[in-house]
Amino acid sequence: MEENKTYIAIDLKSFYASVECRERNRDPLTTNLVVADPSRTEKTICLAVSPSLKAYGIPGRARLFEVVQKVREANNIRRRNIPDHHFTGTSDDSTKLGTDPTLQLDYIIAPPRMALYMEYSTRIYDIYLKYIAPEDIHIYSVDEVFMDVTGYLNTYHMTARELAMTMIQDVLKTTGITATAGIGTNLYLCKIAMDIVAKHIEPDKDGVRIAELDEMSYRRKLWSHKPITDFWRVGQGYAKKLAEYGLYTMGDVARCSVGKTNELYNEDLLYKLFGINAELLIDHAWGYEPCTMDQIKAYKPETNSICTGQVLHCPYDFDKTRLVVKEMTDLMALDLVDKGLVTDQIVLTIGYDIDNLTDSARKKRYKGAVTTDRYGRKVPKHAHGTINLKRQTSSTQMLMDAVMELYDRIVDKDLLIRRINITANKLADEHTVANDDAYEQLDFFTDYEAVKKQREKEEADLDRERHMQEAMLSIKKKYGKNAILKGMNLQEGATAKDRNAQIGGHKA
């Protein structure tokens, strides 16, 4: 008989914002702080918002201008409630703001420091290791972990709730950062307990929330929960398809899955809508999750592609973007060398900027297809293309030539560009690549001696380039990514130098 499992999920509360508060010796629960890079303009996305600032209706992933707007609205209300309509001072502390209505709401904008957050995350993981072995912990993200605690409850003579609280209190005592936890009989339920149920319970004095779910309590509490997008893996696309058939909750999905074959609502409908993904959706609707911690640890992903992308800080023209694409291709080639991989297919996607259609002169010139972005704005349809190489390679020169040929072919020279994505497909281990020369069709009209000499020259060139790539990688690993740069990295509009100093696209 299979052992009953117990899992704990822990999410550090507003992690980046909490770290910035602790670095300033401030209380993360009462300090109004947002982590964002103001140098990227007010359109930049906030990486984190402190709990006290979220109380003003600011979402966790707001854009900076939304924070400015919400704070302005809050201050207008505060000002109207003052007899003489004048503030006596400012404060970014929610406790002071709550006791003194004459203070103007203020907040701290903290530029992101990704290396610092990684350091805190490592320290917190070390705390978890005091209680749970690494093979029973899955690091889901920099601020979230899953744990299989089944074998630890008897050892510690604790309930899952007590063990979760013990670890959270240890983290709080050591770092000053609080957390939310979910406990469940499978990985999905502990995640949902943390993401949905815990958000609707009162925190303790330290801001800690802990919620528990099993299959039956999940159905009782959450089968009627809306919106359905609150559930893990259910995005707007899923929700829209379900809504077209009058399915708005997980309970609706569960009931649909047990419909008879001659009825409209049955599992065939779900498979028609979502294909093989319907299986997991149905499992989750019932509170089932077949995946275990052992399976996560045993999983070895098969690398079939690698992708690099960036959103430019401002609209770039054709030539400046071409420079950035060259930089990205150069770095992708080094990444392939570092991983011992080769490719023979490159995919390039270029996203155009909204200014192409908001500027009257540009809009008048553009005659191509128009689409709508995720914010409902009209933009020119993106450029997308694929190019196949003659051989599998990680050569910078061969990849650069191919990508530049593709870029020049698919990109509209008159449009401003905002997004770039490059993907290397059909990856293979460089040591297992077959020798293409083995099955060559011969003819009487080819000078094979000249062909042989040409190939020998090409191989010698590739060999020299490979040694140079390996030398560059060695220097970069030892002295930093910016220890060695190319001339193009210093040209106007180049982004590689700045991006080399970032983690996850943000300041380190």
What feature does the model see in each segment?
Residues 40, 154, 188, 311, ...:
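Generic "edge-of-domain/loop-turn" microfeature
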Residues 348, 422, 480:
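Hydrophobic, well-ordered secondary-structure elements that form the walls
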Residues 405, 409-468, 473-474:
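C-terminal hydrophobic structural anchor segments
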Residues 150-152, 185-190, 350-357, 425-431, ...:
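Short, internal active-site loops enriched in acidic
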